[in-house]
A protein has these predicted regions:
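Extended beta-strand/beta-hairpin segments
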Residues: 1-53, 64-163
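Alpha-helical metal-binding/catalytic segments enriched in His/Glu/Asp
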Residues: 58-59
Length: 163
């Protein structure tokens, strides 16, 4: 059964090369700026980073759903997304390539191939990935690690267990 959802985001310039963005479902606003390389401020999110963040977040939540429906257990997933932007004053700047580097941690070596297959399936199913029409390269990595102790963060587990 298909369902349709609508999402709204508003953005407005505040001054110079900076602005604010917000959505209906969150009381928080995001301060953003043009990229520092293009004359914007350091230390603020840029529209380029927000696009990559949307892809990383969507990939993460899509993988969680794919893994859950496949009854695949994992201990951690970190998704790094890198985008290359070409600046062209006559035609406008644009992304030339996006690299998606998911790092999946599983309990046993026997899960490695299944984990890789689910990462590839996630790329095909990810809503934001499908919405971006430029080339995207998936560079998945699956590693084995220990199961963190209940209540520990992944960072705590990495430090305390040597994961």
């Amino acid at each position: 059964m298909a369902a349709e959802y609508t999402y709204r985001v508003s953005a407005w310039w505040t001054s110079g090369r900076t602005g604010l963005a917000k959505c209906e479902s969150s009381p928080n606003t995001i301060h953003f700026s043009e990229a520092a390389e293009m004359g914007g401020l350091e230390g603020r999110w840029t529209p380029e980073q927000l696009l990559l963040c949307a892809l990383a977040g969507s990939f993460t939540t899509t993988f969680h759903e794919v893994a859950r429906s496949s009854k695949f257990e994992y201990t951690d997933l970190e998704v790094e997304v890198e985008g290359s932007v070409r600046r062209n004053r006559s035609t406008g700047s644009g992304f030339s390539e996006i690299l998606v580097r998911p790092r999946l941690t599983v309990v046993s070596e026997e899960q490695r191939e299944a984990g890789l297959a689910l990462l590839r399936k996630t790329k095909a199913m990810c809503m934001i990935s499908r919405a971006i029409t430029l080339p995207q390269t998936l560079e998945p990595y699956v590693e084995t690690g220990k199961i963190p102790v209940e209540g520990w963060s992944q960072q705590d587990a990495a430090v305390k267990l040597g994961v």
